[in-house]
């Protein structure tokens, strides 16, 4: 393999240790950072994600609250619970695990979270503020990717960056953060013609579509940085990303693995956002 591996586990360990120090300092002043996680239904993947988030809180000195409800929970009941958490001074961050059951409007639920507790960064107030470069919170996955660029000294200013995927959770905010850092950004998606023509010209490619082998070695410029946000299963049932890792790692300069790349960083930045929320609350108290 010629590419340098961007190790999300190692970087997460460093950043979580820093978060734990900040949490301890806040707790000593009577402001232990608190995160509430709401899970509705029994989606197995969601259960794993929630378990990992709660464990990360416990391991780093955060107060955590897990609310688990059956899939039959009504939308008004969920909104009422969010309202309670908005008013709870022990809770600094509120996270509703997506996807929600079909009868619940996810958009309405996210908008019900107080913007100052929206540690996912999905509320329209934070999403809009991202355009101005002044959000209260940056969405966790793109924020984690930016920390990877910083840690591995990947130059962004003047770089050509391609983001494959246009979701509100990763693609769009990723493009905005790269733009803010001085990159020239192209967003590609399912309707893009000749994807390879864009990716071959890119110094940085972020793949975030949830589709195996969307990026192969012949589509990558030698020495480019490749970030794989995808989370899929291969034919053997093993975790894999959107990138053909075996092939692309022979061409790229830097690459993230799946697992062990972007995934751990997403939870780490959730802790960082919760710390920032707690620090703001403590300063205002």
UniProtKB/Swiss-Prot annotation:
Pfam families reported in the protein's UniProt record: THF_DHG_CYH, THF_DHG_CYH_C
Binding positions for NADP(+) per the UniProt entry: 165-167, 190
Pathway(s) per entry: One-carbon metabolism; tetrahydrofolate interconversion
Ranges annotated as spanning the membrane: none
Gene Ontology biological-process annotations: L-histidine biosynthetic process; methionine biosynthetic process; purine nucleotide biosynthetic process; tetrahydrofolate interconversion
GO cellular component assignments: cytosol
SUPFAM superfamilies in UniProt: Aminoacid dehydrogenase-like, N-terminal domain, NAD(P)-binding Rossmann-fold domains
Keywords assigned: Amino-acid biosynthesis, Histidine biosynthesis, Hydrolase, Methionine biosynthesis, Multifunctional enzyme, NADP, One-carbon metabolism, Oxidoreductase, Purine biosynthesis
Subunit structure comment from the entry: Homodimer.
Family: Belongs to the tetrahydrofolate dehydrogenase/cyclohydrolase family.
Protein's name according to its UniProt entry: Bifunctional protein FolD
């Amino acid at each position: 393999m010629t590419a340098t591996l961007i190790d999300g586990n190692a970087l997460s360990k460093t950043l979580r240790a820093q978060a734990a120090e900040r949490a301890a300092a806040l707790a000593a002043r009577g402001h232990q950072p608190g995160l509430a996680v709401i899970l509705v239904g029994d989606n197995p993947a969601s259960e794993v994600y929630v378990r990992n988030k709660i464990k990360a809180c416990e391991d780093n000195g955060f107060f955590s609250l897990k609310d688990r409800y059956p899939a039959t929970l009504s939308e008004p009941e969920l909104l009422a619970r969010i309202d309670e958490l908005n008013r709870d001074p022990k809770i600094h961050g509120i996270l509703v695990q997506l996807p929600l059951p079909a009868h619940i409007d996810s958009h309405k639920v996210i908008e019900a979270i107080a913007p100052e507790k929206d540690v996912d960064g999905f509320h329209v107030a934070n999403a809009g503020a991202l355009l101005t470069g002044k959000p209260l919170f940056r969405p966790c996955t793109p924020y984690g990717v930016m920390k990877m660029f910083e840690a591995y000294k990947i130059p962004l200013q003047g770089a050509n960056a391609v983001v494959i995927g246009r979701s509100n959770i990763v693609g769009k905010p990723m493009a905005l953060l790269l733009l803010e850092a001085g990159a020239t950004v192209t967003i590609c998606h399912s309707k893009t013609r000749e994807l390879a023509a864009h990716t071959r010209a890119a110094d940085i490619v972020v793949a975030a579509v949830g589709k195996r082998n969307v990026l192969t070695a012949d589509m990558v410029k030698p020495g480019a940085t490749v970030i794989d946000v995808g989370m899929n299963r291969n034919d053997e049932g093993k975790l894999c990303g959107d990138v053909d890792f075996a092939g692309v790692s022979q061409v790229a300069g830097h690459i993230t693995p799946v697992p062990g790349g972007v995934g751990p960083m997403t939870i780490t930045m959730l802790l960082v956002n919760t710390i920032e929320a707690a620090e703001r609350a403590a300063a205002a108290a």
